[in-house]
Amino acid sequence: MALEAVVYPQDPFSYISCKDFPFYDLYFQEEEDQDPQDTKNNIKLGQGQGHGFASNNYNGRTGDYSDDYNYNEEDLQWPRDLPYGSAVDTESQPPPSDVAAGGGRRKRRRTRSSKNKEEIENQRMTHIAVERNRRKQMNEYLAVLRSLMPPYYAQRGDQASIVGGAINYLKELEHHLQSMEPPVKTATEDTGAGHDQTKTTSASSSGPFSDFFAFPQYSNRPTSAAAAEGMAEIEVTMVESHASLKILAKKRPRQLLKLVSSIQSLRLTLLHLNVTTRDDSVLYSISVKVEEGSQLNTVEDIAAAVNQILRRIEEESSFS
């Protein structure tokens, strides 16, 4: 006879002899021949006893102890379409729906907006071509710029060296242009009754090239009150590390060679030199670059050093 039973929650203090049917050994071995209705009554009567059943205030569904829980008769019945002892086929049962599992509306997956591989590859090749053309055009411009100046201004072929050399070359040309400006002479002619008088500027009476010097640091003319007394007319202008020297002195033997060697010994790199002579005077227009480590950082320092060089040259020429 098939026995209908229900599995109740296990009492932690009860005796358990079977994993699937914990109360089978206590009640069902001796009552196999009884009527199923009597068996259910016996199970209900055993709730209040301590024979392995849950107490009358234990809620088997929620795991709580409550007095108002009443067992439903359908819960105590074994499925009638299955023989006793057979397992329930869980594989044939339908899977839980997504709505029940998720607890709400099923989420729609977002479709990623992915570009076509060919389009991405075309964009990459386009960027590479544009960057390649830009670099090619920049190299052409740098090559033209480098060809317009002497090679020692840009000894390396990188962009920073070429641009820096071009800036230095422009500064040197500016200094050279300032030194090559022609003197401005004014001649006024007064006519009187019986004689003509010609007046020239005080510069022409003091010597040639005197109008080349606007604000000299040293002067050998007594009329230059603003300049210190020196061995020659010396004027120095400076822009950053580039300096322009204008020197008007008397001719002396081997003066140019001694002047150039002495200037280079002061850690001044000679960039440009122009020599103009007239009568017994000579005008030197020199462009130099102050090297790192040089002690001459101002126009006053450079002018004083040049004046000292000319003084030494004059002393050597007087002894020879």
From Swiss-Prot:
Domain ACT: 244-320
Subunit structure: Homodimer.
Name of the protein: Transcription factor bHLH96
Subcellular location: Nucleus
Tissue: Expressed constitutively in roots, leaves, stems, and flowers.
Underlying gene: BHLH96
GO cellular component, one term: nucleus
Keyword Nucleus listed: yes
Biased composition (Acidic residues): 65-76
GO MF terms, alphabetically ordered: DNA binding; DNA-binding transcription factor activity; protein dimerization activity
Range of residues in the leader sequence: none
Lineage, opening ranks: Eukaryota, Viridiplantae, Streptophyta, Embryophyta, Tracheophyta
Keywords in alphabetical order: DNA-binding, Nucleus, Transcription, Transcription regulation
Sequence ranges of Basic residues compositional bias: 104-114
SMART domains linked to this entry: HLH (SM00353)
Domain bHLH stretches: 122-173
Gene3D superfamilies in alphabetical order: Helix-loop-helix DNA-binding domain (4.10.280.10)
Annotated region described as Disordered, given as residue ranges: 30-121, 184-206
